[in-house]
């Protein structure tokens, strides 16, 4: 760069810094190199599938899928993980369906959880913005986007047409929220439902409510749905297997999958999850129904193996460390096990 251009650029940078503050513009090579700050999901398998070790802070995350698929359970587990690390969490309950007893069983400290049950979509999103602007909240969950009803629709009559109101509301709110969340380092998790598009013959007929804005602004999108048969002990169903697909990821390669086991009444079992991941990584050997770690037999059946590890925390951490060393062997690309 010649001298005149260099001086002009330096003067422009000084003017910008004076007007907008230090750091408003900087050379990429001078920017501090930082690892992405994350909140663990409570599942090692999902943390590995995300590629960064959890849900990114300062970003928007969308968790969507069919009903009773484990979306709210996953979001509450993330809240529990944030609280366990001394963080503050908020739950915007637009569906008015939060069960405090279930949240407590998942490990959420309900006495410290900030909860709002807003009357309109505008009120819900303003609350999210104000909480994020405070800089004191680590994670905010909105349950759900489909329940963020614009005020005009609530005040109107049944049967009135309100085309595009919710999509415009979301678009306007997310434009403001993106910068606020980045500055406050707050993770915002939007839970969403799925709908069927009418008249779609080819391709995926599913779509999510709230327009396209959330798809664009979300750094991570997780598709959560049941997979296979329920988990049974004898003839009794005790839980469900859930497959989480990372549909979008701006921070690591997307299209990875994780299979979680959600048990009725207690949610994710992190030790059973570790056993699954350790088997996939070759750290724990499975022969028939027996699970072994090196020369040590852990037990017959996953429940017995998990129970043995709960009694030996030092062994649990040793296995976790070995799994993380072999994390590239654990992550399964979408469709890899389906013959695609």
Swiss-Prot record:
One of its GO terms (cellular component) is cytosol. Pfam families: RecA (PF00154), RecA_C (PF21096). It comes from the Bacteria. Keywords: ATP-binding, Cytoplasm, DNA damage, DNA recombination, DNA repair, DNA-binding, Nucleotide-binding, SOS response. The keyword DNA damage applies. Coiled coil: none annotated. PROSITE patterns: RECA_1 (PS00321), RECA_2 (PS50162), RECA_3 (PS50163). GO terms for biological process: DNA recombination; DNA repair; SOS response. It is found in: Cytoplasm. The keyword ATP-binding applies. Can catalyze the hydrolysis of ATP in the presence of single-stranded DNA, the ATP-dependent uptake of single-stranded DNA by duplex DNA, and the ATP-dependent hybridization of homologous single-stranded DNAs. It interacts with LexA causing its activation and leading to its autocatalytic cleavage. Belongs to the RecA family. HAMAP family: RecA (MF_00268). This is Protein RecA. It comes from Thermus thermophilus. The gene is recA.
């Amino acid at each position: 760069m010649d001298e005149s251009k260099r001086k002009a650029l330096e003067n422009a940078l000084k003017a910008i810094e004076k007007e907008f503050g230090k750091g408003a513009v900087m050379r990429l090579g001078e920017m501090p190199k930082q690892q992405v700050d994350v909140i663990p999901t409570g599942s090692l398998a999902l943390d590995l599938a995300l590629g960064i070790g959890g849900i990114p802070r300062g970003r928007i995350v969308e968790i969507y899928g069919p009903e009773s698929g484990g979306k709210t359970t996953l979001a509450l587990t993330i809240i529990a993980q944030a609280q366990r690390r001394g963080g503050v969490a908020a739950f915007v309950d637009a569906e008015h369906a939060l069960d405090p007893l279930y949240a407590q069983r998942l490990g959420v400290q309900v006495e410290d959880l900030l909860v709002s049950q807003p009357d309109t979509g505008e009120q819900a999103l303003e609350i999210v913005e104000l909480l994020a602007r405070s800089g004191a909240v680590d994670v905010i969950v909105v349950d759900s986007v489909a329940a963020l009803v614009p005020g005009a629709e609530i005040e109107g009559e049944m049967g009135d047409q309100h085309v595009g109101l919710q999509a415009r509301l979301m678009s306007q709110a997310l434009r403001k929220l993106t910068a606020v969340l980045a500055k406050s380092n707050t993770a915002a998790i939007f839970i969403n439902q799925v709908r069927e598009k009418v008249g779609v013959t080819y391709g995926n007929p599913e779509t999510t409510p709230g327009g396209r804005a959330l798809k664009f602004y979300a750094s991570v999108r997780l598709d959560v749905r049941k997979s296979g048969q329920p988990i049974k002990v004898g003839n009794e169903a005790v839980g469900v297997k859930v497959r989480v697909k990372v549909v979008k990821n701006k921070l690591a390669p997307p299209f990875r999958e994780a299979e979680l086991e959600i048990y009725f009444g207690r949610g994710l079992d992190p030790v059973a999850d570790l056993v699954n991941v350790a088997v996939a990584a070759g750290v724990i050997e499975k022969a028939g129904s027996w699970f072994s770690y090196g020369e040590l037999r852990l037990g017959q059946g996953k429940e017995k193996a998990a129970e043995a590890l709960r009694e030996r925390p030092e062994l649990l951490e040793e296995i976790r460390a070995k799994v993380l060393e072999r994390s590239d062997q654990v992550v399964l690309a979408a469709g890899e096990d389906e013959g695609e």
